[in-house]
């Protein structure tokens, strides 16, 4: 039977207090760096989105619809890697806010196309300008060429 005493016998002597955290191994991983960069950029953008009453996912949904009027929910889920049950509530909320409408799809009678209302289009014109500015601020450590390269490399990872 293993006891706490047996387990502690297997441990090295008690380490000293950690003054500086060593994350050097994690910093060699693409996933860790991509996540940390995403958190930094999103953290900079979130307060700007709040003034429009949007979260990042709301902004992404509205942006895709803005640039693809008539898109179906299925296409939207594919574009944003969302599960259909998660999208249904978001679409309903945005529709109640008067930002989008659903209408019969011209080729598929079972599907509904999504389209922004005039209010939704006006909001997105302002929100996309704001996000572009906020993202420029959060990536100001990069040159224009570095920013383009970073986007291209990230897309290479998730688009294949």
What role is predicted for each listed range?
Residues 1-52:
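N-terminal leader segment of winged-helix/HTH proteins
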Residues 73:
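Helix-turn-helix DNA-binding elements, focusing on the entry/boundary residues of the two helices
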Residues 35-38, 63-67, 128, 155:
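Short, locally clustered residues in the helix-turn-helix/winged-helix DNA-binding domain
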Residues 83-86:
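Helix-turn-helix DNA-binding motif, specifically the short coil turn and the N-cap/start of the second
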Residues 42, 70, 92-158:
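Charged, amphipathic alpha-helical coiled-coil/dimerization segments
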Residues 64, 79, 97:
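Residues within the alpha-helical elements of helix-turn-helix
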Residues 33, 40, 44, 60-64, ...:
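Pre-recognition alpha-helix immediately N-terminal to the DNA-recognition helix
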């Amino acid at each position: 039977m293993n006891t706490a005493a047996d387990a502690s016998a297997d441990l090295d002597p008690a380490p000293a207090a950690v003054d500086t955290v060593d994350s050097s191994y994690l910093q060699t991983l693409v996933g860790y760096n991509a996540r940390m960069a995403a958190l930094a950029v999103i953290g900079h953008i979130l307060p700007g989105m709040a003034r429009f009453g949007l979260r990042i996912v709301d902004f992404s949904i509205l942006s895709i619809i803005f640039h693809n009027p008539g898109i179906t929910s299925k296409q939207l889920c594919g574009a944003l890697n969302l599960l259909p049950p998660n999208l249904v509530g978001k679409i309903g909320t945005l529709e109640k806010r008067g930002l989008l409408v659903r209408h019969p799809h011209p080729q598929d009678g079972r599907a509904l196309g999504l389209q922004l209302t005039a209010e939704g289009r006006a909001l997105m014109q302002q929100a996309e300008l704001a996000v572009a500015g906020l993202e420029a601020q959060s990536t100001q450590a990069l040159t224009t060429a570095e920013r383009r390269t970073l986007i291209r490399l990230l897309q290479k990872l998730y688009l294949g």
